[in-house]
């Protein structure tokens, strides 16, 4: 079975990449067993709690990341450098528990996947 990675690089608002990636991830989880989810650059912002998308007339899809464990998606990785560059740390309040990795470890973990889909 192929190992499939989903890489989130865009923030939660401004374009539909995060929402579309999450939809694709949930659909793929019904067909694949070995899925990894990676957050880097502005993609780390997808995991922040307390977002208020209604104020910009956007849909609140970020909380849906919290149900990934119900879909047996447990391999979650966040680039620690990306979070630090945005002034975030482990205490920032996250919608799910992702493993914090250095950029080098993040890339190494990603390289173990056969297919990479970037959103």
UniProtKB/Swiss-Prot annotation:
User: What is any one of the record's Gene Ontology cellular component terms?
Assistant: cytoplasm
**Has keyword Cytoplasm?**
yes
* Chain segments annotated as transmembrane: none
Q: Which residues form the signal peptide?
A: none
Task: Write out the entry's keywords from A to Z.
Answer: Cytoplasm, tRNA processing
Q: Which InterPro entries match?
A: DsrEFH-like, Sulphur_relay_DsrE/F-like, Sulphur_relay_TusC, Sulphur_relay_TusC/DsrF
UniProt subcellular location: Cytoplasm
GO annotation (BP), single: tRNA processing
- A Pfam family per the record: DsrE
Q: So what family is this one in?
A: Belongs to the DsrF/TusC family.
> What job does this protein perform?
Part of a sulfur-relay system required for 2-thiolation of 5-methylaminomethyl-2-thiouridine (mnm(5)s(2)U) at tRNA wobble positions.
PANTHER family noted in UniProt: PROTEIN TUSC
Assembly and partners are described as: Heterohexamer, formed by a dimer of trimers. The hexameric TusBCD complex contains 2 copies each of TusB, TusC and TusD. The TusBCD complex interacts with TusE.
Q: What is this protein called?
A: Protein TusC
Q: Which gene encodes it?
A: tusC
């Amino acid at each position: 079975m192929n190992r499939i990675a989903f890489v989130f690089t865009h923030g939660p608002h401004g374009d539909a990449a995060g929402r579309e990636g999450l939809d694709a991830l949930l659909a793929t989880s019904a067909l694949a067993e070995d899925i990894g989810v990676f957050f880097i650059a502005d993609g780390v912002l997808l995991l922040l709690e307390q977002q208020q998308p209604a104020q910009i007339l956007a849909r609140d899809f970020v909380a849906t990341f919290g149900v990934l464990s119900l879909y047996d998606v447990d391999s979650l990785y966040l680039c620690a450098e990306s979070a630090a560059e945005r002034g975030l740390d482990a205490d920032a309040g996250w919608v799910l528990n992702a493993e914090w990795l250095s950029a080098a470890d993040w890339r190494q973990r990603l390289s173990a996947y056969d297919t990479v889909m970037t959103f």
